[in-house]
């Protein structure tokens, strides 16, 4: 009998790294040529940020952050274990990992093999230390659910959603939005036994191919003025339609399904109103209304 559990998690900041590395993105941003010099000046930073940096370059705050997130993910994992799903559908963005010049769908669900593995420290971590002190050849073992993926894709297409799907990766084993989600949900490394269906979304839209994902947009020159923009990401109303259709399909399925929305929490919330990246202001406005 169909049952649905909804959960929300973050797949960023860089919780994969030891606490000493949690300020890495912030420091990278300060070196970026596309960030205004005035915003790199500590004199312009709010007191909350300066307090977190403290006199140890943010290490104490990073330890508190790591402990909090670890406990939060343990709590979410317990909810998931108590529900004991037949399948776990995870929404996340693809940042030029498999959505590249050869194909950029708005959405794509992944019906991977019943047993597959990913080597997160070999594929994308660049040899950096990780929080769990795992070697480069350590493998995250996961399970796909192709039958459920086919059921979901079929139901979406029948409801007017032109759903792309794939049974194997095209360029990268798995987008970090999904890899990090599964790493964090298995914080204590007891294994992740539930079959998964990653559901990739083109959140980068017009900037995906030019920026090539990640933080590259902070370093690359702007698009030439005479070059036409790439198509946008799916609009919010379409995302709502897709989400509603997913709920309808799974409600009519034989599966106990956990639906997990995986995103990144704002890295600029405490920077308002002096933002390193002004385009993040709408996200802060939304946060203030919650």
Predicted regions and their residues:
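Active-site histidine-anchored catalytic micro-motif
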Residues: 3-290
């Amino acid at each position: 009998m169909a049952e649905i559990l909804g959960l929300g998690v973050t797949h960023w900041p860089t919780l994969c790294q030891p606490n000493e590395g949690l300020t890495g993105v912030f420091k990278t941003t300060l070196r970026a040529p596309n960030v205004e010099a005035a915003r790199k000046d500590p004199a312009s930073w709010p007191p909350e940020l300066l307090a977190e940096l403290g006199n140890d370059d943010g290490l104490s705050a990073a330890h508190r952050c790591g402990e909090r997130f670890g406990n939060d993910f343990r709590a979410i994992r317990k909810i998931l274990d108590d529900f004991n799903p037949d399948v776990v559908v995870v929404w996340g963005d693809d940042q030029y990992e498999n959505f590249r010049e050869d194909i950029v769908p708005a959405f794509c669900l992944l019906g991977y093999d019943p047993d597959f593995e990913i080597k997160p420290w070999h594929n994308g971590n660049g040899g950096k230390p990780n929080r769990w002190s795992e070697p480069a050849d350590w493998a995250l073992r996961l399970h796909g659910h192709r039958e459920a993926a086919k059921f979901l894709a079929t139901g979406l297409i029948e409801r007017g959603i032109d759903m792309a799907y794939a049974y194997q990766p095209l360029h990268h084993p798995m987008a970090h939005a999904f890899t990090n989600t599964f790493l964090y949900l298995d914080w204590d490394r007891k294994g992740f036994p539930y079959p998964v269906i990653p559901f990739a979304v083109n959140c980068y839209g017009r900037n995906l191919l030019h920026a090539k994902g990640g933080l590259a947009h902070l370093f690359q020159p702007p698009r030439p003025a005479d070059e036409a923009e790439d198509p946008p990401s799916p609009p919010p109303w379409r995302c709502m339609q897709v989400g509603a259709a997913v709920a309808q399909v799974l409600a009519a399925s034989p599966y106990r399904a956990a639906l997990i929305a995986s995103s990144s929490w704002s890295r600029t919330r405490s920077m308002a109103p002096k933002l390193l990246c002004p385009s993040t202001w709408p996200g802060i406005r939304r946060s203030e209304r919650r």
